[in-house]
Amino acid sequence: MKFVLKSISKNSGRLGQLRIKQSKELQTPLLLQTTKGGSIPYLSAEVFDLVSQEHQQVLQLTLSTMDQMSESLAQWNRSLSDYVGYPGYNTLLLLRDPCETTPTGGNDRDVVPLFTRHGKESLTAARYMDMVANFAPDVYQGLCDADTNPESTKKRVQKSVDRTERFMELCYEQHSKLARLKDSTLLAPIVGGYSTFARTQSIKHARQQPAGSYGGYILEGFHTNGLAATELKAAQLLPIVEHCVQQLEEEQPRLMPGAYTPLLLLELIRLGVDVFDSSYAYCAATNYKALTFSYVRDKAEHAAFLDVTDEAIKEDFKPLLEDCSCLSCQKHTRAYIHHLYKTHELLGTILLMIHNLHHYMCFFEAIRASMAADQLPELIEHVRMQNTTAEVNYRIEPNNKVVGKAAMGKGFIAAAV
């Protein structure tokens, strides 16, 4: 993997180009496509191709949702992207699913807990590297203890750093020995919770490795994934990230997985983080929210979301978002998608996922354009206020509404009698 900086600005972050193997150059800041079990959630490969036209794509795969495929992949002699049905796509393998809350605990001295749909599996560093070798992704993260959050104690934070160092010693060794990983790039994990001292220790351990041992950094241990990432406070997170990036080489890309809010994501980009994922769009769709925030500076007021469970839109025949060119907005209305929610139709979530992914990919195009014009601060302020009088709240609230049978109507069969 090769990363080249195109420009860097104190106010607008850094633009770069990332090339994975022999792929086309990928522009950074880059949006990774979050997957579950190797598939884009709710979308077939054919539908996703329609959604992602003219957008660059890298698949973010997770071991916690694909662990059962390890044995069959060991016998696979083609690329991982071919195996999951997305031939030609670059692949990046993570340990944990950023879309779902990762349970805490289960951290023994020499193992990391892997929470899968089959239960908890204890991974040693040797077992982890064997599984990664079976997958043979283009890029993968080193094994780390990232079980920390804003409430973690100093003792838990220090343990996460010490254990990660032990895991990574074997990961660095095996990365150079395993034949199936000779074309793969290792990302060095930077952990340490919200302690600048612990983060510095983690960074020093990575930078002590011989040149070429790894090809980038992944900053972990800020949250427990899922909706927890949307609740992070900028005042807590940003100083720690800034402390980290100041100690990292400029020529190495930096990845931060998680469903960060659009506003916090922009602030992280300003600090110098290069790669993110689409888990925020997924979390919004699964909680019946269509992304409607504006990333084009205008004078109209905008909201962060449209809640399709709201009874107020049951007779609203406008698209989810005016002037949106996605398939959902071109073909369907708010009232119809509200009806799909009330009748528990899977198509409702599919249409929301199509819209949210399209909106988020276009958001990243706007980010790169603003950075090229050195206008990222103006975009941050626009996203922050959305032309309203108060800062917009981008936190995703879990949908706990229950649709009763009475609200679903009599149904077609009963109505025909």
Swiss-Prot record:
Heterodimer of a catalytic subunit and an accessory subunit. It comes from Drosophila virilis (Fruit fly). One of its GO terms (molecular function) is tRNA-guanosine(34) queuine transglycosylase activity. One of its GO terms (cellular component) is cytoplasm. Keywords: Cytoplasm, Metal-binding, tRNA processing, Zinc. PANTHER family: QUEUINE TRNA-RIBOSYLTRANSFERASE ACCESSORY SUBUNIT 2 (PTHR46064:SF1). SUPFAM superfamilies: tRNA-guanine transglycosylase. This is Queuine tRNA-ribosyltransferase accessory subunit 2. Belongs to the queuine tRNA-ribosyltransferase family. QTRT2 subfamily.
